[in-house]
């Protein structure tokens, strides 16, 4: 057989690995450890798509490589299985979300195993397993005990179609929900919050110690949004009321000509004049219908209403009208801003729209034309005139503190984490509310608080979750006869994914989250690979929980993930018509290398686009494995380009990878393999070992595969293959194409053992040095010959070889040699007449 029969070979080795528990995590503590983590998937009904295996293949290559290097490797997989889609499906079909989830997991697992990933399935976790979420609930009770989980009446992002509130992070820029694209409105509700803000400074500072891309670190820094400035107190004219504004530029206070409160600010109703009451009430209602993102969109038209009240500017005693406007959020800062229209573009546009005064306090611009937002010396600012920004800020803060109307302040953009969902399919929050007004956490001995099985999972309609309908589960009585009600909100999907990497370390422990010694052995995660879409939410939440567990003494490290790598996106093929509208692939036909709309006949433009069901351009890995084999899919996805690049899927590229594997198969099975080395492949073999080793370490898998191709090309030119080089090459390709490598290893090594733990090959540095060198021979200054000669020959030897060359002899025949200039390792110049 001259080709690689994947349909026979791949299932054979998958069966072998499963039967022999080949990838069971090593426990020899004398060995170094390597923990390779994938972002575990949500097991959707659609199954795996070809984007999933890209990251999984990368961690699998590293895991197989490290095993061969003698490491204990922890390479696990599990399921982030709570979440809205399963519940939505259950509501639409009447099926149990648990059954639906179990079916999806079985399908995902089948697909993953068909790709030959070296997971230790003994460590599989599932966030919906009560033995798992017992510890999610335990972490919550600890947060509650420490005052980091609390209830608050807060305006939430309510999605009527989903029957639940969602976190700020789950609202898209257009003001719709990330899941489903439904309208989001603001609505006050009793919610559980987690005090992530208590960890803001540590979450910010500890980013510096992590081997993460700067772009991801910057996204987290921006989300945390640390600002240093001052709180300034403004009194409301004619009342005993006052409000506080946080500003990063207290030095511009002399240019503050009006103030703006969030429509929800507690002072609004108290200070609004009777003449303005109706307009204010209308505006407040309109603002409540918009999401935070829609309200703060810089491009939107400025709207606002004057309250009829005035604030007093503390630095000059001037009256400043107090407005309300929806671009100010009650949840951000103090819910109030001082407007300096001369030096802030949004304030300038607002002032122009409503004819409010603009006072320049920094020189350098023309504030009648636009806000001047650069720095300049202070003007029109009394005791700050002539000062630069830094000096002016220091002086005004000292003045405010001395007068008792302000002080220096650090704030964060980060808000506390909205932790409740009004849905059924999530972890029950282990809290009981008693009729005497107290609340207590469910004792640890009673955890897990198991999610009750029910067919009635529709939202209750009251804003509570469907659990509010389950009276038997809901109502409890204390030993002293006091009645209570269980918390009906459930946890968000982020809960289970915030600590799952810890449970992999000790997944069957019934006494604690994980054993301390095992946590010490395995943490931190050495490499975490996943999509950049989780840059803020999941990674920030997991870091927060990890730091909290560090403070409790549960985990030994301050950070969970030492190195993070975001793989790029695998794009599908899309087609657009002349209007730029996308056309589904089943409406496209190819003729003479061009693409046409089946129905209209219009020629279409081909371009990469995100794979989606609607475009019918999603590639199912099952189809690829069936036609080309898992090893082809693995090699192709790693060879497409750099791991972090977004690249379009190509059937031709897939075929190229398959042809390469067939060439590898033929090389090893048809070449004569000998115990003696004739030295012909010394250099290319040692170059290949060195390059592949270094490129796997630096995650440059595409260039590693390119080097393997170089070796195959060189080896194919030789009649025979040295056995040690054949073995070494098979080991080098094993992390990329493990099924093929196992099969070829049996033909060459004949041990009957798996290749998985055979020591990784090493290279001989001395074999990388060129033994021969090319020199040029010039006659009368023109190159007449190029010769391969031994390196470092003397002038005399070089001259002798050059003059003996047949080509050179023919050129100088019948001519007198005047002089021969020989430069070792470079050239021979012959002067004749």
From Swiss-Prot:
The keyword Protein biosynthesis applies. The keyword Electron transport does not apply. It is found in: Cytoplasm. ATP binds at residue 613. It catalyses: tRNA(Leu) + L-leucine + ATP = L-leucyl-tRNA(Leu) + AMP + diphosphate. HAMAP family: Leu_tRNA_synth_B. This is Leucine--tRNA ligase. The lineage of its organism: Bacteria, Bacillati, Bacillota, Bacilli, Lactobacillales.
């Amino acid at each position: 057989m001259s080709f690689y029969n994947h349909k026979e070979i791949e299932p054979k080795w998958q069966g072998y690995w499963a039967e022999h528990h080949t990838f069971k995590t090593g426990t020899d503590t004398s060995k170094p450890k390597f923990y390779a983590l994938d972002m575990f998937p949500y097991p959707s009904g659609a199954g795996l798509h070809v984007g999933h295996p890209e990251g999984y293949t990368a961690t699998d290559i590293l895991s197989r490589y490290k095993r061969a290097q003698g490491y204990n490797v922890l390479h696990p997989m599990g399921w982030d299985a709570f979440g809205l889609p399963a519940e939505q499906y259950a509501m639409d079909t009447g099926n149990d979300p648990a059954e639906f989830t179990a079916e999806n997991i079985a399908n995902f697992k089948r697909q993953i195993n068909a790709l030959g990933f070296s997971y230790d399935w003994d460590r599989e976790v599932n966030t919906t397993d009560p033995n798992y979420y017992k510890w999610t609930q335990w972490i919550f009770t600890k947060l509650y005990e420490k005052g980091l989980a609390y209830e608050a009446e807060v305006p939430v992002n309510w999605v009527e179609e989903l029957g639940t509130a969602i976190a700020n992070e789950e609202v898209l820029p257009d003001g719709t929900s990330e899941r489903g694209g439904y309208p989001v409105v603001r609505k006050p509700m009793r919610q559980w919050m987690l005090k992530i803000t208590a960890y803001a400074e540590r979450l910010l500072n500890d980013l510096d110690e992590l081997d993460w891309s700067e772009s991801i670190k910057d996204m987290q820094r921006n989300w945390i949004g640390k600002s240093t400035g001052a709180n300034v107190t403004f009194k409301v004219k004619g009342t005993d009321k006052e409000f506080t504004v946080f500003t990063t530029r207290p030095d511009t206070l002399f240019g503050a000509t009006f103030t703006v409160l969030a429509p929800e600010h507690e002072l609004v109703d108290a200070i609004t004049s009777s003449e303005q009451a109706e307009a204010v009430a209308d505006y407040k209602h309109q603002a409540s219908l918009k999401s935070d993102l829609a309200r703060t969109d810089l491009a939107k038209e400025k709207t606002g209403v004057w309250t009829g009240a005035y604030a007093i500017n503390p630095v000059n005693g001037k009256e400043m009208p107090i407005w309300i406007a929806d671009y100010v959020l009650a949840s951000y800062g103090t819910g109030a801003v001082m407007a300096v229209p001369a030096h802030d573009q949004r304030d300038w546009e607002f002032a122009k729209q409503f004819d409010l005064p603009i006072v320049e306090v920094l020189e350098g611009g023309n504030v009648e034309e636009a806000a001047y937002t650069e720095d300049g010396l202070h003007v029109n600012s009394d005791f700050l005139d002539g000062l630069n920004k830094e000096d002016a800020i220091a002086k005004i803060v000292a003045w405010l503190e001395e007068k008792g109307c302000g002080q220096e302040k650090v704030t964060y953009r980060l808000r506390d984490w909205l932790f409740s969902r009004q849905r059924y399919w999530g972890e029950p929050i282990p809290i009981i509310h008693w009729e005497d007004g107290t609340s207590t956490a469910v004792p640890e001995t009673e955890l897990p608080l198991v999610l009750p099985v029910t067919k009635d999972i529709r939202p209750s309609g009251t804003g509570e979750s469907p659990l509010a309908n389950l009276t038997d589960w809901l109502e409890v009585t204390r030993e002293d006869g006091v009645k209570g009600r269980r918390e009906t909100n459930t946890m968000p999907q982020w809960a289970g994914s915030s600590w799952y990497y810890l449970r992999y370390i000790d997944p069957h422990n019934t006494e604690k989250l994980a054993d301390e010694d095992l946590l010490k052995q395995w943490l931190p995660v050495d490499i975490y690979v996943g999509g950049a879409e989780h840059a803020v939410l999941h990674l920030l939440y997991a870091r927060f929980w990890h730091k909290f567990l560090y403070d409790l003494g549960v985990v030994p490290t301050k950070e969970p993930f030492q190195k993070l790598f975001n793989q790029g996106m695998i794009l599908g093929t899309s087609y657009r018509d002349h209007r730029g509208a996308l056309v589904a692939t089943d409406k496209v036909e190819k003729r003479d290398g061009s693409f046409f709309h089946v129905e209209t006949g219009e020629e279409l433009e081909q371009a990469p686009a995100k794979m989606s069901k609607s475009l019918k351009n999603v590639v199912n890995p099952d189809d690829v494995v069936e036609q080309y084999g898992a090893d082809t899919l693995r090699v192709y996805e790693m060879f497409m380009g750099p791991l972090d690049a977004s690249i379009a899927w190509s059937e031709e590229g897939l075929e190229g990878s398959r042809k390469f594997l067939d060439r590898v198969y033929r090389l090893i099975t048809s070449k004569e393999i000998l115990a003696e080395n004739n030295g012909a492949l010394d250099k290319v073999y040692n170059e290949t070992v060195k390059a592949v080793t270094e490129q796997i370490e630096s995650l440059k898998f595409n260039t590693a595969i390119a080097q393997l191709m170089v070796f195959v090309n060189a080896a194919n030119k030789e009649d025979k293959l040295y056995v040690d080089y054949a073995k070494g090459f098979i080991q080098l390709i094993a992390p990329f194409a493990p099924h093929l490598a196992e099969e070829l290893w049996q033909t060459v090594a004949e041990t009957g053992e798996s290749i998985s733990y055979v020591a990784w090959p090493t290279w001989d540095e001395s074999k990388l040095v060129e033994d021969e060198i090319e020199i040029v021979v010039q006659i009368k200054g023109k190159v007449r010959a190029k010769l391969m000669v031994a390196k470092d020959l003397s002038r005399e030897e070089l001259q002798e070889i050059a003059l003996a060359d047949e080509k050179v002899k023919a050129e100088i025949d019948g001519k007198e040699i005047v002089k021969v200039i020989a430069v070792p390792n470079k050239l021979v110049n012959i002067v004749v007449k």
